[in-house]
Amino acid sequence: MERVRQMFSCVSGMIYRPTDSIAEEYHKWYYGNFVWNTTTWMGIKCLKSVSDMWNYQEILIELEPSLVIEFGSRFGGSALFFANVMMHIGQPFKVLSVDISHKDLDPAARQPDILFIESPSTAPAIAEQIRRLKNEYPGKIFAILDSDHSMKQVLAEMKLLQPLLTAGDYLVVEDSNLNGHPVLPRFGAGPYEAIEAYEREFPGDYEHDVAREKKFGFTFATNGFLIRK
């Protein structure tokens, strides 16, 4: 029993570190209790913060993009969410959702306006597919990165999108709350560090949408609401 208590204490310490910030404490509680792991859209898992999802629909309504790019499909709930919001906007659109494996994809997520592709997100074929969709659905782009959370992968995805996004397009880098920002301090370099590395290399590409990031008090996309300049 003592060994179990020690193990639990170790795991809890990785997830929860008290601070004086109420918002940060709530963030840690929300993440550490896996609320995000039981969040669904129309019955399909999303694995997101509900306040982030609300923020995304506000961004989509304001931006009125014609193309939504999602790296990381998993169950398909978020792709369906984006498609449902886009249908309300009422203009031609496509949601491109890419994942290295669609074994967990819920069949109910498959809709005519969503193109699911099983592939590494950084494959040249994905960049080419995005170019084709840009021609077919001209206009603004909303892109969101939520696949492998390693720094290397996220940085590669940001670089893949660099020549494909233009001024006014929107990029969200999710799970940048990992590695102590403020959850899972021992995770290792992840999305947050990828954003920092990208901005060191390409300092003029993005403006941070701080108002969006701070709107609901916490976000899983810490430092990751980006508007292309």
Curated annotation (Swiss-Prot):
EC identifiers of the protein? 2.1.1.-
InterPro entries, per this entry? RhmsylMtase, RNMT_CmcI, SAM-dependent_MTases_sf
* GO biological-process terms attached to the record: DIM/DIP cell wall layer assembly; lipid biosynthetic process; methylation
User: Where are its TM segments located?
Assistant: none
Per the UniProt record, one Pfam family is: RMNT_CmcI
Cross-referenced SUPFAM superfamilies = S-adenosyl-L-methionine-dependent methyltransferases
Q: What class of enzyme is it?
A: transferase
Domain of life according to the entry: Bacteria
Gene Ontology annotations for the cellular component aspect, listed alphabetically: plasma membrane
Protein family (similarity comment)? Belongs to the rhamnosyl O-methyltransferase family.
The record, for NCBIfam families, names:
RhmsylMtase
Protein name, please? Answer: Rhamnosyl O-methyltransferase
Q: Which organism is it from?
A: Mycobacterium leprae (strain TN)
